[in-house]
Amino acid sequence: MPKHSPPDTSPVARFEQSLQELEQLVQNMETGALSLEQSLGAYERGIALYRECHQALEQAQLRVRILSDPMRPDDGEPFDPSIVSTSQ
């Protein structure tokens, strides 16, 4: 029986999904059809999604820098997302 690797749940892997959900929230809020309570909930969710997307972009940028470092051309270490600061 083949082993299935668990799905990647890193921010980089979830970036597209988070961005799509954020764009949908913005569209819903721009229509003006949401109540105040719904708008606040959507805003809270939007902030969380924005932070996830921002973290994913930071990780991707760091990953590119590590891979592009001319001082370490033979460095074959896998990227460790825990080295990226998650504090905002």
UniProtKB/Swiss-Prot annotation:
This is Exodeoxyribonuclease 7 small subunit. Its EC number is 3.1.11.6. InterPro entries: Exonuc_VII_S, Exonuc_VII_ssu_sf. One of its GO terms (biological process) is DNA catabolic process. Belongs to the XseB family. Heterooligomer composed of large and small subunits. It holds the Pfam family Exonuc_VII_S. It catalyses: Exonucleolytic cleavage in either 5'- to 3'- or 3'- to 5'-direction to yield nucleoside 5'-phosphates. PANTHER family: EXODEOXYRIBONUCLEASE 7 SMALL SUBUNIT. Bidirectionally degrades single-stranded DNA into large acid-insoluble oligonucleotides, which are then degraded further into small acid-soluble oligonucleotides. Keywords: Cytoplasm, Exonuclease, Hydrolase, Nuclease. One of its GO terms (cellular component) is exodeoxyribonuclease VII complex. It comes from Xylella fastidiosa (strain M12). SUPFAM superfamilies: XseB-like. It is found in: Cytoplasm. One of its GO terms (molecular function) is exodeoxyribonuclease VII activity. The keyword Hydrolase applies. The keyword Membrane does not apply. Residues 69-88 are annotated as: Disordered. Its main location: cytoplasm.
